[in-house]
């Protein structure tokens, strides 16, 4: 693998994990965003989840019909909304309460979001460490080249 590919792969991981952290933050911020059950115009916030995918690059020496690919990191081709039903809370005094007195809130579990946040942070840190290691190797190679 060429040296600069390691920078690109690590950078793609950092970018994807930063997006994941942004989505987690959005989920936590909107945990108490209310909606009105049954009203399509007043639906509660839906938890957003990134879909991760490999970045693949076709190699130049591929035989037609037998393409070969190099792994070039990760990216987020799309963001999905959690299909889980909203949680209903009985609060007849709320302005969004339905005729039975229920208000819809996002079905977001704060503990799961915190675990995801720690996971994304650790993955981001691993990418930073990989970039620093690649940088150190490049510097050593330059020193060796100088003689």
Region roles according to the model:
Residues 1-147:
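Amphipathic alpha-helical polymerization modules
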